[in-house]
């Protein structure tokens, strides 16, 4: 399942590395959390996804299921993770689970597929959250979106930064597909996405609700800033585009 297989227990990673050594790629997955809690204060690095792993490439760095929780601490880092753009393949996969990145955490060089896929279609009660408050940089998603959701609450905190990332996906850099709730309070800058930075999309499964807060800065990007699809709702309380 993964280099570390968590089943209802607690992982506290205060340091160290999971993945390939310098210049060496590991094939497979770093962390598979089937329930339980993971606190990642070390580094997940140099991992290439493979369909031979259980659940394939759904979460090459972190796979969360069964109401598990994972936090990338202020000292935590995920870097140099690659995979194949197909289906829901991604570096971080979370279904009915909570995933958090703290201020100071770093995610970089996730290339060739999605960084994160979030599915919380669970009676539409939005009981789980992806809360991003660290830095995401230098990710080249190719024909995939950087982030994609299917329902769920996704919050970009005031310390969050997404910079120097790229996507040629029809869903843009951040693709909120059906019923998601988004809060943007951080910075999105110096990115390139031909279909835009944020696509609030309803493809027949429920309108998206999004808020841009006073601390938000969506600036210096190549591509339109925000695209609002039918039955989606965007409220701008402040901030800068």
Question: What is the meaning of each model-derived region?
Answer:
Residues 10-18, 37-44, 70-78, 99-103, ...:
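All-beta strand scaffolds that present successive hydrophobic residues in beta-strands
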Residues 1-7, 22-34, 48-67, 79-96, ...:
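Extracellular beta-strand/beta-solenoid scaffold signature
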């Amino acid at each position: 399942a993964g280099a570390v297989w968590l089943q209802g227990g607690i992982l506290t990673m205060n340091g160290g590395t999971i993945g390939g050594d310098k210049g060496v790629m590991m094939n497979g997955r770093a962390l598979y959390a089937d329930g339980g809690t993971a606190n990642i204060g070390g580094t997940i690095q140099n991992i290439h996804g493979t369909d031979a792993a259980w659940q394939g490439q759904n979460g090459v760095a972190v796979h969360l299921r069964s109401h598990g929780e994972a936090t990338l601490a202020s000292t935590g880092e995920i870097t140099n993770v690659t995979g194949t753009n197909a289906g829901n393949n991604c570096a971080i996969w979370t279904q009915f689970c909570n995933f958090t990145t703290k201020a100071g955490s770093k995610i970089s060089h996730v290339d060739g597929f999605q960084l994160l896929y979030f599915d919380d279609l669970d009676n539409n009660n939005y009981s789980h959250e992806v809360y991003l408050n660290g830095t995401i940089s230098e990710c080249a998603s190719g024909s995939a979106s950087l982030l994609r959701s299917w329902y769920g609450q996704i919050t970009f905190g005031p310390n969050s930064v997404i910079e120097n990332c790229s996507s040629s996906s029809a869903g843009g850099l951040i693709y909120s597909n059906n019923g998601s709730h988004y809060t943007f309070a951080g910075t999105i800058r110096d990115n390139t996405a031909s279909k835009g930075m944020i696509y609030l999309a309803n493809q027949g499964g429920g309108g998206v609700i999004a808020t841009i807060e006073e601390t938000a800065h969506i600036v210096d990007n190549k591509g339109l800033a925000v695209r609002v699809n039918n039955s989606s709702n965007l409220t701008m309380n402040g901030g800068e585009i």
